Amino acid sequence: MTRIHVDGASYEVRSGGDGPPILLIHGFTGRGADWAPFLPALRRVATTITVDLLGHGRSDSPADPARHAVERQAADLAAILRQLGASPAAVVGYSLGARVALRLAVASSGVVARLMLESPSAGIADPAARATRVAADEELARILDRAGIEAFVERWENLPVFASERAMPDLDRGRLHAARMRNRAPGLAASLRGAGQGAMEPLGSRLAGVRSPTLVVAGPLDGVGADRAIAIAAAIPAARQMMLEGTGHAPHREAPDRFADLLVDFVARSAPLPTSERKPT
């Protein structure tokens, strides 16, 4: 474990293995340790780097929501990779982590060798829809402020976006619940306000500038989220898109064996994607 200080904030970073670097970025309410089930296989072919985003795990939780912004954390991660001598790196991100990864690819293209986005969003361009999302995230943040982590997790786990997780084995669901409960309410509240989809600068018009070979992974049970993933893959020139059948918003949790195969294959691909794979069908 390493503490790396960037722009006044301290991040918890872990690395291991041997080979080309791969940065794995967790989702909201998660932490770098979420990727632990996949690390043994990855470390046979790569040097893995996991990080706790701000407000999560053992990284700092700045009180100012603006410090949690996707744009600032993407810049932080670019700096961390450079400090580690791990740039350019393959970058994998899930949900919030996918948004950070996508911003990293847009703003610091030389840092990202390859890009894997699981259940991504490029932000919300429509002002009305964006305002609606900001209001929804503020409601969740107020639950954290007023009622604490237990009430928030109860609400969070019953959101429609996570309905497909109910099919996971009870043991896995129990571990996931326990991990969510270990979060700090102030950190999650600041993250919601500063790094939520509504707070993020929309990237739609800039996706065509992403030159890194990209794999976009989603679950068809994610509904609108799956549609977003398809649209993002279509907008990135060197992208291919894959749906993991029977999964929703979190394919890496709902189908870990299939997702692990995708991850290892992603790391093994060092050449640009063939033309036939560049667009979703």
PLM feature segments, named:
Residues 9-62:
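Conserved HGGG/HGGXW glycine-rich cap/lid loop of the alpha/beta-hydrolase fold
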Residues 223-228:
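Conserved alpha/beta-hydrolase "acid-adjacent" motif
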Residues 247-260:
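Catalytic histidine-centered segment of alpha/beta-hydrolase-like enzymes
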Residues 71-89:
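Conserved acidic catalytic loop of the alpha/beta-hydrolase fold
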Residues 106, 112-145:
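Flexible "cap/lid" loop of the alpha/beta hydrolase fold
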Residues 127-131, 143-206:
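Conserved alpha/beta-hydrolase catalytic His-Asp/Glu region
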Residues 210, 216-218:
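Short beta-strand/loop motif that positions the catalytic acidic residue
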Residues 93, 97, 101:
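Gly/Ala-rich beta-loop-alpha elbow adjacent to hydrolase catalytic centers
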